[in-house]
């Protein structure tokens, strides 16, 4: 009896598990627990028979003085724990590294010329893994020095072949931060741990079943292969799981209303769905939505990574629609063209929410009335999950912007509040509607309405910050959102602001508006804690990331890009991290 192997865990495997758990804790969802638990179960169930065989045939052994004693199928409990902790650690590293990536946009329909290329890549991988299995089988048949290598390849090869065949598209298309990095980082770490363990004799490989080659001094080539293969299995398993989830949640025409914790059978159905059935327009819409958010709002782009998958997709599509609608109006050559765009969008919404019109009519109107670059944003709007009134109010907000052509429209703080409710409060309301769609709550209708109203107020607060930030930019396009009665009290006219938006009196009014923003924010922020738990942290990040702009404006220590105050990326990341860990 001894504690050498247990000490390996205490020193080298448990500390990374604690660190990774702490780092990922703010993001953990029920789905993540399900994914990790599912893979741990498979890892243990598939490894025990193989490892037991290695021990019973003398290929692998553990001196009695290094283990505590209890065994399962001849395997020391420390080794069984190793199966669990390795799978857990590698899975959490994968989850952390892949979190910023919106994976559904990496799905591919494999149509046209790309189809043959994808098939060749799939076949190349299959041939590679089949060759490894065949070589492993040959090593086992011949016995001797290649036995351990052969057993590794024959055991791991079929799993890798299966996972590759199911998820090769994701494995090849996703960034290396989602694929290679979560394989090689833990592999390199375990190579170092294994080197120390083999030198101390914590576990021993029989000399007649190994080649005697070393990757470096103290690390047997077979052990290096084992850790590379097992970490590849874990990451391939996570990728296959996420591939299935992406298919389930991206294509409602294939899977209507999938569960947030889908069964293994449903996951397999998703993986076996032919790529030719994927909807090109859906993937394009999501891809354009991600790029729009990345270009137009770095704060919300960072916050979007904290939202769970299906909700994240709908929020991206909602933002994309709002952004496109706003740009159509703002970029119009004159007021008549802008009014025409609003009329077309109103017609679009009437068609979408009409019970009598078929989808083909909606599609035709979009193709006839809107530029190709904007069509996917309209086609993919998650209208069935939203009530029509906030969208109609958003159009009223655009109409208020057009009224600037005739002169100032924001005469009092009440006018500014109404405007902000229409252009920002409405968006916040729709975000909350999407949250309650994906994560039903036990709250009654009245309580939900209170939360929606608070969301509307929070949208107003964010819009106040936006206006305070963009005083100079807005002046360049002939708009002043500061109330006229404020300007009068400060001894300024509307034209004074248009001509010189950086004068000292305006800086004072900016701070005054920010005070209003933070006052509204303080009254509304507690309602966030009544949202479903899956959305609380992400919504806090979205709000705090934007309110940080207000804090920087208050401090007057900010960078200016294109006439706007910006928050450095490092500070945005720190705000997001602090917010996620605050409650």
From Swiss-Prot:
GO molecular function per UniProt: geranylgeranyl diphosphate synthase activity; intramolecular lyase activity; lycopene beta cyclase activity; squalene synthase [NAD(P)H] activity
Keyword Ribosomal protein among UniProt keywords: no
Predominant location: membrane
GO cellular component: membrane
Keyword hit for Membrane: yes
Function: Bifunctional enzyme that catalyzes the reactions from geranylgeranyl diphosphate to phytoene (phytoene synthase) and lycopene to beta-carotene via the intermediate gamma-carotene (lycopene cyclase).
Region span, Phytoene synthase: 250-583
Subcellular location: Membrane
Reactions performed catalytically: all-trans-lycopene = gamma-carotene; gamma-carotene = all-trans-beta-carotene; 2 (2E,6E,10E)-geranylgeranyl diphosphate = 15-cis-phytoene + 2 diphosphate
PROSITE patterns in the cross-refs: SQUALEN_PHYTOEN_SYN_2
One Pfam family cited in the UniProt record for this chain: SQS_PSY
Annotated EC: 5.5.1.19, 2.5.1.32
Protein name as it appears in the record: Bifunctional lycopene cyclase/phytoene synthase
Topology relative to the membrane: Multi-pass membrane protein
Gene Ontology terms describing biological process: carotenoid biosynthetic process
InterPro entries per the UniProt record, alphabetical: Isoprenoid_synthase_dom_sf, Lycopene_cyclase_dom, Squ/phyt_synthse, Squalene/phytoene_synthase_CS, Trans_IPPS_bact-type, Trans_IPPS_HH
The family this protein is said to belong to: In the N-terminal section; belongs to the lycopene beta-cyclase family.
Keyword list, A-Z: Carotenoid biosynthesis, Isomerase, Membrane, Multifunctional enzyme, Transferase, Transmembrane, Transmembrane helix
Functional pathway: Carotenoid biosynthesis; beta-carotene biosynthesis; Carotenoid biosynthesis; phytoene biosynthesis; all-trans-phytoene from geranylgeranyl diphosphate: step 1/1
Transmembrane feature ranges: 3-23, 35-55, 75-97, 120-140, 151-171, 173-193, 221-241
């Amino acid at each position: 009896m001894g504690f050498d192997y247990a000490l390996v865990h205490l020193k080298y495997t448990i500390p990374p598990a604690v660190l990774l758990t702490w780092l990922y804790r703010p993001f953990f969802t029920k789905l993540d627990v399900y994914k990790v638990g599912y893979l741990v179960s498979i890892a243990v169930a598939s490894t025990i028979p193989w490892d037991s065989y290695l021990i019973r045939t003398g290929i692998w052994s553990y001196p009695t003085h290094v283990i505590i004693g209890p065994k399962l199928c001849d395997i020391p409990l420390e080794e069984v724990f190793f199966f669990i902790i390795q799978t857990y650690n590698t899975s959490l590293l994968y989850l952390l590294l892949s979190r910023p990536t919106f994976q559904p946009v990496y799905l591919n329909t494999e149509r046209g010329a790309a189809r043959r290329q994808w098939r060749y890549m799939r076949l190349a991988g299959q041939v590679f893994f089949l060759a490894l299995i065949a070589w492993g089988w040959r090593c086992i048949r011949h016995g001797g020095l290649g036995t351990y290598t052969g057993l590794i390849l024959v055991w791991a090869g079929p799993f890798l072949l299966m996972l590759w065949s199911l998820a090769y598209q994701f494995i090849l298309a996703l960034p290396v931060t989602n694929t290679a990095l979560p394989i090689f980082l833990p592999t390199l770490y375990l190579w170092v741990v294994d080197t120390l363990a083999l030198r101390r004799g914590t576990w021993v490989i029989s000399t007649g079943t190994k080649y005697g080659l070393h990757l470096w001094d103290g690390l047997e080539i077979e052990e290096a292969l084992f850790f590379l293969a097992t970490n590849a299995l874990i990451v391939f398993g996570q990728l296959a799981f996420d591939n299935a989830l992406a298919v389930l949640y991206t294509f409602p025409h294939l899977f209507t209303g999938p569960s947030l914790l889908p069964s293994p059978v449903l996951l397999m159905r998703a993986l076996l769905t032919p790529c030719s059935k994927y909807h090109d327009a859906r993937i394009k819409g999501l891809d354009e939505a991600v790029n729009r958010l990345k270009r137009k709002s770095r704060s919300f782009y960072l916050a979007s990574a904290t939202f769970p998958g299906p909700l994240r997709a709908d929020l991206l599509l909602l933002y994309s629609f709002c952004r496109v609608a706003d740009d159509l109006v703002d970029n119009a050559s004159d007021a008549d063209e802008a009014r025409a765009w609003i009329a077309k969008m109103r017609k679009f919404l009437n068609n979408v929410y009409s019970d009598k019109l078929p989808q083909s009519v909606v599609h035709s109107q979009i193709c006839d009335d809107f530029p190709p670059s904007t069509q996917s944003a309209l086609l993919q709007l998650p209208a069935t999950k939203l009530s029509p009134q906030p969208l109609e109010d958003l159009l009223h907000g655009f109409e208020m912007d057009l009224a600037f052509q005739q002169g100032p429209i924001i005469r009092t703080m009440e006018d500014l509040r109404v405007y902000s409710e229409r252009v920002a409060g409405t968006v916040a309301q729709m975000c909350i509607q999407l949250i309650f769609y994906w994560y039903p709550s036990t709250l009654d209708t009245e309580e939900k309405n209170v939360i929606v109203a608070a969301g509307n107020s929070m949208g107003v607060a964010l819009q106040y910050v936006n206006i305070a930030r963009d005083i100079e930019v807005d002046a360049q396009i002939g708009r002043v959102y500061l109330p006229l009665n404020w300007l009068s009290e400060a001894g300024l006219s509307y034209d004074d602001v248009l001509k010189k938006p950086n004068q000292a009196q305006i800086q004072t009014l900016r701070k005054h508006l920010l005070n209003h923003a933070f006052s509204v924010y303080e009254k509304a922020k507690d309602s966030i804690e009544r949202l479903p738990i899956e959305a609380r942290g992400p919504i806090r990040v979205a709000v705090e990331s934007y309110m940080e702009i207000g804090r920087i404006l208050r401090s007057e220590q900010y960078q200016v890009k294109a006439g706007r105050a910006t928050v450095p990326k490092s500070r945005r990341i720190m705000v997001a991290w602090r917010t996620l860990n605050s409650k």
